[in-house]
């Protein structure tokens, strides 16, 4: 057997590491989602200390190695560190390493041949201490790659991710591992920033504030929860001991942007086949981004400041309505200005070497101001000739803040405040705590809207002769409620304790969420001017006849004051506790075993719980094996369960309050400013036909009793190999299976059958509202059959007649990586995957439905027929490659490649004629079934959208004569390949063929060029 030192020297030569050996044994490590660790081994423990010092802030930690030479330093802020081995007051070895968020950095030392010689080492690219899957990107790496400055573009660099449907999150809501776009968790400095109302997308920060972005695609430990998709974990920059200022300006000019494709009617046998549907080729888009930052020490080594502000302005001119819209002649052209102002302020206080406070303030404020003008397609639209004939008189528009045009399509910002504490109580005990809050305001103001002015309706036959009826409120219908908001208060506490070969980590977190959401009648209500045929008859059971008030009432004239509102103030309480043990079973095998216990409680606007899910245990087990004992070959595996909460917005539709009241008056005149009636005399009090006076629904009638949450099981097996200093490669297999889901169903038939069988009065004619339930399982309900009393109803899965939810994701990932060496870095990922089932999850990309967790998928059993197949987020093949090359100190280039097979196609039509039996409620749904022209059309069996092929490139120049200046050009979609991303899948309109069936909804963005000038100055 070789001596240890001889073996290590041989490995050093083999791997090209001239000074620092890779660990022969690996100490137990447990990572935090807001920091990283350094661990390793020294040759001689006696009389040795290991000093870890941040090169930029001076933060200093000292560790005493164990008898076997192992050491670890936990809960370190991300950044660059010097690790020094001290003996007899002198440095005998050292290494300079990077600490990444949520990861361990192995820094081990062998006996130096001359102990007084200081040696600088290089860390391994493989983290043996981690069992999760994903990728971490530093600010330096992101600056080199040609990507747009959004979190969504970082996510797409990672394997097992794809872009979600373009109708979600303004096209920036990703899918991880076949999950829905609402099933991800986003964190900034440990604080959850996911959109709490719909869970689609998240608040962001100035892109230049990102120090590191960790994208976890699976296998995450017990500390992470509330995700069955992926986790995005961002750490922000901090100030250092050197003052630094800088900024950048970038522009994507419309003159360097290629024209987007027109959209034409598909060829499906309709008279419109091949004709122009949406004219796009004269659409214009430009974007300008300005970013300024400052950072430095308030007190050297103690107190630091980093502040960053960013403004993004996007100007668009485009058609917004298609050629089949009669409204296009007035509002078919849009001029739009989107502005997003973002800011971050970070304060770091190193109280001493063992205690640290971090305060973070983030502001993300997206706004959109849209003006609508006329667009005349005219006869030219039929021939396909350029039909551009826009008007210049503004006839419509809208203003949005964190909203619109639909709730799930919006980018949603927030104002966020976070306070983090880290206490290294000893070498073996670390305590971390976090408290924070976020606030979001949603605003929607249509063009010409007059707050507080009621809408009016009348006809010539209902108007009093001689009076002038005016329209005071130009906006009709319902609007987002005034003062809509989301608030979130968060706290977490974590304790890590090392004892022997075990590092035990435990903690808890609590999220309290409150929202005001829903819609109400624009202006507050409607004045409906009416005339009774017989003025002497009462208008209703609780209303008098118009003639009883005399005057115009004797001729039957009266007005109805209508108030309609679906506004609710729902709230959610989310809590979790976890414990995890990282056990170094042998010198080469690490086992992480943990369990997470989740509790979700959703309340209606009256603070009554309508769903409460407790004791949801999620076991997690991860194993890593350092096969060669030198960190050059890692085999790993994971198995675990993951739960997901329901979004807050479910309460608005399913459990929210409903207000629909009427009150009758006679009147004598019309206000010429508002159109409201004057001279009112009551004919009735406030009435409501269905007793809708703004009270919430009985929470017991909203959802099945004792529901289980949506949860998923996952298995991951893989390996990573550091083959040489120039090559890492690996493979990974992932399997995910959805075990339970929550959706609503609206079928009265099971309740009718139960009531008839149990002799309940009125059961045969019972009309059910929608219930939340677990599809494919037995469910218990509380039902009012019309008596005002609730009846317990137990329905088996067979009686409900729904299949069990099914969603599986199986993937094989292969990667090869050239670490940053000899001036270049590159990585290639290939994924072969299959995403199959009868539900996408909480969203429904088939139609872009906006009702997260209350989709139409399980409304009726007939909707599930033929629904098992390839799901919308399935991409059978994906090849991702990115990297950069530094030609000289002044010139570098970068590239980013995506090659992906297209999304599966569906034909979703009417039920066949045989289902149109009397009383079948499913026939009311129209084109929502997996039948095409009366024939079964199983999900995902009609081919795919075209292959997506995108190449992005950049070039950067840093002139030596102006230190700190960087000039860069990025070209996105350099080949200008525009392919369909999704299509209209509804086959029928009424009983006929939908002329838009097969129509492209969105294409790949056309080629564009971004020019950037950046300047950084260090004092």
Pin down the residues of each PLM region.
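Transmembrane beta-barrel wall of Gram-negative outer-membrane proteins
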Residues: 280-371, 408-436, 619
């Amino acid at each position: 057997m070789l001596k240890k030192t001889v073996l290590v020297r041989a490995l050093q030569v083999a791997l090209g590491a001239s000074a620092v050996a890779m660990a022969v044994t690996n100490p137990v490590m447990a990572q935090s989602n807001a920091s990283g660790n350094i661990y390793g081994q020294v040759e001689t423990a006696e009389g040795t200390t290991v000093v870890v010092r941040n090169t930029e802030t001076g933060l200093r930690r000292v560790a005493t190695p164990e008898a076997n030479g192992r050491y670890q330093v936990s809960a370190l802020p991300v950044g660059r560190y010097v690790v020094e081995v001290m003996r007899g007051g002198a440095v005998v070895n050292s290494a300079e390493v990077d600490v990444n968020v949520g990861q361990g950095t192995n820094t081990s030392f062998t006996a130096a041949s001359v102990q007084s010689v200081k040696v600088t080492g290089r860390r391994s690219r493989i983290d043996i201490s981690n069992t999760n899957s994903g990728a971490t990107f530093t600010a330096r790496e992101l600056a080199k790659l040609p990507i747009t400055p959004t979190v969504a573009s970082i996510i797409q660099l990672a394997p097992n991710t794809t872009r979600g449907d373009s109708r979600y999150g303004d096209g920036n809501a990703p899918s991880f591992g076949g999950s829905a776009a609402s099933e991800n968790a986003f964190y900034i400095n440990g604080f959850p920033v996911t959109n709490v109302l719909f869970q689609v997308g998240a608040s962001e920060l100035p892109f230049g504030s990102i120090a590191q972005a960790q994208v976890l695609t699976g296998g995450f430990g017990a500390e992470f929860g509330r995700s069955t998709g992926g986790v995005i974990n961002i750490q922000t920059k901090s100030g250092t001991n050197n003052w630094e200022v800088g900024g950048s300006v970038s522009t994507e000019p419309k003159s360097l942007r290629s024209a987007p494709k027109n959209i034409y009617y598909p060829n499906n046998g309709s008279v419109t086949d091949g004709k122009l549907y949406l004219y796009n080729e004269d659409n214009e888009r430009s974007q300008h981004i300005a970013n300024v930052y400052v950072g430095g020490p308030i007190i050297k080594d103690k107190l630091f400041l980093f502040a960053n502000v960013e403004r993004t302005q996007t100007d668009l001119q485009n058609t917004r309505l298609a050629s089949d819209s009669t409204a296009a002649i007035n509002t078919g052209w849009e001029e739009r200005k989107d502005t997003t102002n973002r800011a971050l302020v970070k304060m770091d206080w190193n109280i001493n070497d063992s205690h640290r406070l971090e305060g973070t303030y983030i502001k993300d404020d997206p706004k959109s101001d849209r003006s609508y003008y006329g667009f005349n397609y005219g006869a030219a639209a039929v021939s396909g000739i350029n039909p551009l004939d826009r008007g210049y008189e503004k006839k419509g528009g809208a203003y949005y803040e964190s909203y619109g045009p639909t709730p799930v399509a919006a980018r949603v910002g927030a104002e966020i405040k976070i306070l983090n504490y880290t206490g290294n109580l000893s070498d073996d005990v670390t305590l971390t705590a976090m408290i924070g809050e976020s606030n979001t305001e949603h605003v929607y103001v249509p063009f010409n809207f007059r707050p507080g002015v009621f809408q009016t309706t009348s006809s010539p036959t209902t108007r009093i002769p001689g009076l002038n009826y005016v329209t005071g409120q130009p906006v009709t219908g319902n609007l987002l409620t005034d003062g809509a908001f989301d608030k979130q208060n968060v706290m977490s506490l974590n304790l890590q304790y090392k004892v022997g070969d075990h590092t035990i980590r435990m903690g808890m977190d609590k999220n309290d969420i409150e929202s005001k959401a829903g819609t109400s009648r624009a202006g507050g209500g409607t004045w409906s001017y009416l005339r009774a045929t017989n003025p002497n008859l009462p208008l209703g059971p609780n209303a008098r006849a118009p003639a009883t008030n005399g005057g115009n009432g004797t001729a039957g004239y009266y007005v109805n004051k209508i108030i309609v509102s679906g506004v609710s103030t729902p709230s959610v309480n989310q809590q979790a506790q976890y414990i995890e043990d990282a056990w170094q079973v042998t010198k080469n095998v690490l086992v992480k075993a943990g369990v997470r216990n989740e509790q979700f409680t959703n309340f209606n606007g009256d603070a009554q719980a309508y769903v409460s899910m407790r004791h949801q245990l999620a076991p997690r087990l991860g194993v890593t094996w350092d096969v060669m004992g030198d960190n050059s070959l890692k085999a790993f595996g994971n198995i675990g369960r993951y739960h997901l909460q329901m979004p807050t917005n479910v309460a608005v539709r399913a459990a929210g309050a409903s207000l629909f009241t009427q009150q009758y008056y006679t009147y004598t005149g019309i206000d010429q400013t508002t159109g409201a009636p004057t001279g009112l005399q009551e004919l009735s009090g406030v009435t409501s036909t269905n007793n809708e006076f703004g009270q919430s629904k009985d929470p017991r009638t909203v959802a099945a009793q004792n529901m289980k949450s949506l949860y998923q099981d996952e298995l991951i097996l893989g390996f990573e190999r550091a083959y040489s200093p120039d090559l890492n490669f690996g493979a990974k297999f992932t399997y995910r299976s959805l075990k339970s889901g929550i959706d609503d169903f609206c079928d009265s038939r099971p309740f009718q059958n139960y009531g008839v069988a149990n002799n309940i009065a009125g059961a045969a004619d019972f009309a059910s509202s929608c219930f939340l339930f677990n599809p494919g399982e037995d469910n218990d309900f509380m039902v009012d059959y019309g008596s005002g009393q609730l009846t317990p109803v137990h329905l088996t899965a067979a009686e409900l007649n729904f299949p069990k939810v099914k969603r599986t994701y199986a993937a094989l990932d292969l990667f090869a990586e050239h670490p940053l060496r000899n001036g270049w870095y590159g990585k290639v990922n290939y994924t072969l995957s299959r995403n199959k089932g009868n539900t996408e999850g909480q969203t429904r990309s088939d139609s872009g439905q906006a009702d997260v967790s209350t989709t139409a998928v399980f409304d009726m059993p007939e909707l599930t027929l033929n629904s098992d197949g390839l799901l919308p987020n399935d991409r059978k093949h994906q090849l991702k490659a990115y990297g950069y090359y530094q030609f000289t100190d002044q010139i570098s280039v970068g590239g980013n490649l995506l090659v992906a097979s297209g999304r599966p196609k569906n034909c979703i039509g009417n039920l066949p004629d045989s289902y149109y039996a009397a009383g079948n409620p499913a026939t009311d749904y129209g084109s929502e079934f997996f039948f095409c022209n009366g024939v079964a059309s199983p999900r995902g069996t009609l081919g795919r959208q075209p292959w997506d092929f995108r190449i992005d490139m950049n070039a950067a120049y840093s002139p030596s004569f102006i230190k700190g200046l960087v000039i860069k050009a990025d070209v996105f979609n350099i080949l200008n390949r525009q392919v369909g991303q999704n299509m209209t899948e509804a086959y029928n309109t009424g009983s006929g063929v939908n002329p838009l069936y097969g129509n492209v909804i969105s294409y790949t963005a056309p080629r564009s060029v971004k020019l950037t000038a950046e300047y950084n100055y260090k004092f």
